[in-house]
């Protein structure tokens, strides 16, 4: 490919992803943590104000930092928040991951809880981002990391949004939640990797884990939510026909558990939302809903 053609392709890609060639682009950085050079991508929209919110996005097992959740950059352009895509460390299988206590992660020394907290503090200080309005989302293995953070650091993030995430059995049995946290989960009922009804016998090899509704009810109870509202999202119409039936739009049922304890002193009541994607697969479910828009809609409720 000649240099002119290469430049043309790069410009077209930038226009497609960011909307115009003058838009900001994610940048690659490293961060030293426990003798490891950890990588991350950082997106700072043009015109970002001081004390802007920060959203951290975690990839799935074996993934790359920006493999999922890229559309949050488009939301960030409009809403003016920073987006960080950290990279998981490599495990014994040579796969990038978040250390959440899968059976095959036994002996893995990586402390991702500490890494994410220290990386967030670094970004807040370096770029003048909000310490209060920092949020966490992630898909699959990244979703499991979100749940682990909810147990161990509920006061660090203003709200948490696991996507196709699980609560491993050991988390439920061995950890005592240190408080409530606004939480939303998006999960397909036909997910073949992270089963909606759980895997108590560990047939999938990820370790035993509980059913998604039970996992979510943990945080409903922690928040002492007093009532549930159930709505169906409008069916999404794809502009381009899908070539895979698995990616056809699905009905999404939103369960909102409300009336919880104050999210902070004199703050709004804590809420927990569950997006039940009927027949949905193991994905960000963006073929069925505007997932990144919904994530920000939830996070925005907890800005203070």
Where are the model-predicted features located?
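Active-site glycine-rich loops that stabilize anionic/oxyanionic intermediates
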Residues: 59-63, 280
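Conserved acidic catalytic loop of the alpha/beta-hydrolase fold
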Residues: 114-132
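Short beta-strand/loop motif that positions the catalytic acidic residue
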Residues: 185-187
């Amino acid at each position: 490919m000649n240099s002119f053609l290469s430049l043309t392709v790069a410009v077209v890609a930038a226009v497609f992803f960011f909307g115009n060639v003058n838009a900001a682009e994610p940048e690659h950085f490293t961060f030293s943590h426990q003798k490891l050079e950890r990588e991350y991508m950082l997106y700072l929209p043009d015109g970002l104000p001081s004390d802007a919110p920060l959203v951290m996005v975690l990839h799935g097992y074996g993934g790359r930092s920006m493999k999922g959740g890229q559309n949050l950059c488009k939301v960030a352009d409009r809403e003016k928040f920073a987006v960080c895509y950290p990279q998981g460390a490599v495990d014994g299988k040579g796969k990038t991951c978040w250390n959440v206590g899968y059976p095959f992660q036994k002996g893995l020394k990586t402390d991702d809880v500490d890494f994410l907290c220290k990386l967030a503090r670094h970004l807040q200080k370096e770029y003048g981002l909000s310490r209060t309005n920092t949020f966490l989302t992630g898909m699959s293995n990244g979703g499991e990391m979100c749940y682990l953070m909810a147990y161990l650091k509920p006061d660090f993030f203003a709200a948490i949004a696991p996507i196709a995430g699980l609560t491993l059995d050991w988390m439920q049995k061995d950890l005592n939640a240190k408080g409530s946290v606004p939480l939303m989960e998006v999960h397909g009922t036909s997910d073949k990797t992270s089963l909606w009804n759980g895997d108590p016998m560990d047939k999938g090899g990820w370790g035993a884990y509980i059913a998604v509704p039970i996992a979510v009810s943990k945080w409903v109870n922690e928040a002492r939510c007093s009532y549930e509202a159930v709505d169906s999202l409008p069916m999404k119409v794809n502009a381009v026909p899908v070539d895979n039936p698995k990616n056809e739009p699905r009905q999404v049922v939103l369960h909102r558990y409300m009336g919880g304890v104050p999210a902070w002193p004199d703050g709004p009541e804590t809420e927990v939302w569950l997006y039940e994607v009927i027949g949905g697969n193991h994905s960000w479910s963006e073929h069925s809903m505007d997932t990144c828009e919904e994530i920000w809609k939830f996070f925005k409720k907890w800005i203070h």
